[in-house]
Design a protein with these regions (language model features):
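H/E-rich (His + Asp/Glu) clusters that bind or coordinate divalent metals
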Residues: 157, 184, 192
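N-terminal pre-catalytic segment of deacetylase/amide-hydrolase enzymes
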Residues: 1-31, 36-50, 66-69, 187-191
């Protein structure tokens, strides 16, 4: 079973986080998780330039450390960035102290007030501590572009089916999502415009 939209009960557990933005006009927020990755992030940046679209990249600190010039290029092209932990760790597997330490280590490189937990997983204590320093941005549409059980057309169909005004959509600029992303992202941008 795939869940492209977070269940209501989960959104109610973390009401202070941002799941979508209220919006009457046609405004959609594209976000990318897990980069920067040299094999895919430049392609994403070029595509966004081609369509004159800005996005927010939730970056993994260790990827930023390995690809500092690529991270700088994201910012140079006018996109926003957010923190996605240093090592893409799941909050539910770590103590509050260790999780916050990992997030803060990433922020030494990323320098952003935005945070998104990998897989959307965090504990109440972690969320409470994170809110002291960061704005927690979740999503209301996850494309599942990384899934081997979906093809690019199904990923695109997820975007069409679940997106509404104010939606925060998650794609992944990662190697495991590359094939589906290369198919679905251009079609999604065309459809969203």
């Amino acid at each position: 079973m795939f869940i492209e939209r977070p269940p209501l009960f989960y959104r109610m557990l973390f009401p202070e986080t941002i799941w979508r933005l209220p919006c009457k006009e046609k405004t959609i927020y594209l976000t990318f998780d897990d980069g920067p990755v040299p094999e895919i992030t430049p392609w994403v940046l070029n595509l966004l330039d081609y369509y004159n679209v800005k996005a927010t990249f939730f970056c993994v600190g260790e990827n930023v450390a390995r690809n500092t010039e690529l991270y700088a290029e994201i910012l140079k092209r006018g996109h926003h960035t957010g923190n996605h932990t240093m090592n893409h760790i799941q909050g539910t597997k770590y103590s509050v102290k260790d999780y916050i330490r990992n997030v803060d280590a990433a922020n030494e490189l990323i320098h952003s007030a935005l945070f998104r937990p990998p897989h959307g997983h965090m504990c109440f204590g972690q969320a409470h501590e994170l809110r002291q320093k960061y704005k927690i941005i979740m999503w209301d549409v996850v494309t599942r572009d990384y899934s081997k059980k979906l093809n690019g057309e199904r990923v695109f169909n997820n975007v069409k089916k679940y997106t509404r005004n104010g939606s925060i959509i998650v794609f992944h600029d990662s190697l495991k999502g590359e094939k589906n992303l290369r198919h679905a992202l251009p079609k999604s941008i065309e459809w969203l415009k």
